[in-house]
From Swiss-Prot:
GO terms for molecular function: signaling adaptor activity. Residues 152-248 form the SH2 domain. Residues 20-120 form the PH domain. Residues 390-410 form a coiled coil. GO terms for cellular component: cytoplasm; plasma membrane. Residues 291-320, 338-364 are annotated as: Disordered. The lineage of its organism: Eukaryota, Metazoa, Chordata, Craniata, Vertebrata. Its main location: cytoplasm. SUPFAM superfamilies: PH domain-like (SSF50729), SH2 domain (SSF55550). This is Signal-transducing adaptor protein 2. Phosphorylated on tyrosine. Phosphorylated by PTK6 at Tyr-250 modulates PTK6-mediated STAT3 activation. InterPro entries: PH-like_dom_sf, PH_domain, SH2, SH2_dom_sf, STAP1/STAP2, STAP2_SH2. It comes from Mus musculus (Mouse).
Amino acid sequence: MATALSPPRGPKLKGAPPSHYYESFLEKKGPCDQDYRKFWAGLQGLAICFYNSNRDLQPLEKLDLRLFSKLRDEALLGSSRDTAYHFSLVLRDQEVKFKVESLESCEMWKGFILTVVELRVPSNLTLLPGHLYMMAEVLTKEEVRRAAEVPWCFLQVSRLEAQLLLERYPECGNLLLRPGGDGKDSVSVTTRQILNGSPVVKHYKVKRAGSKYVIDVEDPFSCPSLEAVVNYFVTHTKRALVPFLLDEDYEKVLGFVDSDRENGESAWAVPSFRASGPALPANVLKPLPPVPVSVSSQEDKLPQLPPLPQLPDTDENYVTPIEDSPAAEYMNQDVSLSSQAVPLKPKKPARLPAKPPKPSVVPKPDLKAITSVWTRKLGGSSSQASSLVTRLGDITAELEEKLQKRRALEH
């Protein structure tokens, strides 16, 4: 059985090339680059896209013109062989330098950038009528594009939240759009500026009139879109007001590039679970939580502390004199014991006299009385009594002799 032939497959359609307001080769040097790098660049809305070649569909990097501050011409500081033209794009967070081969390309890039940023065709550049006509067409396209989208500085916040955002992130801008307080299609504008060191917060009402927005000021001004409302506040304040753009360079959700096994195409995927930490193996037991112990049980288990040793008596460090009588009598010795005792200074030890004290005078013994006493005790032994009397006389004579010698030494 014959099978129906399938139609031949046609060539795979490639993606449509991106549409740019203006595109050409452009050499770029960022704040982290040491030298210029050549790209194929294109202006797309409020962004400058950089490609490796004019055949690439995805840009390598972009510059956000919503952070535009000013354009500045660069002086030629290189060698005489460098005939390129230089200009710088100053943004709120960085400054990027560019280099092009001709003056026409330099003026074209500056003209288109100012057209999409300021929503007007610049008149201070060296441009031909054809160039001005091209920029007028770009201006119309950009106004239509912005009318269909909400400005980046429009946030769904309340009046108080808008004030807090402008106060907390002053580096992100000082002008913010929010829904009106009447619950209708109206819009409110909140601004915050510093005057003599003090913040000044203002709120403006924008009414909806059909397809237009009317700024409710002394001289009401009608705008075709919310983007035009933002541009009105920026241009009429000499760019003192800057649209609020919260820095969201960091992602909040983890993602990765995943390839489809069926068709082989790559797509951005987000994990379906959030791991709080490394999972434990199945055979590893989880540690048990600590058991709370009451204070009373802990006190019962604690060993008793040994008693503290007694402190030494401070009086032991002092020498107490024995029978140290006062040297003189004072009038205030009758003070009661309840009064505060005054510590006395230790007395100096008394000096010994240079000469020994005089010995007390001993009376002379009565020889007759002594002789009579011993005579009675010895009974009738006259010979013993006479010998004893003789010895006593000798002792008495010896004592008298020693006494006379001592008196002689004293005198």
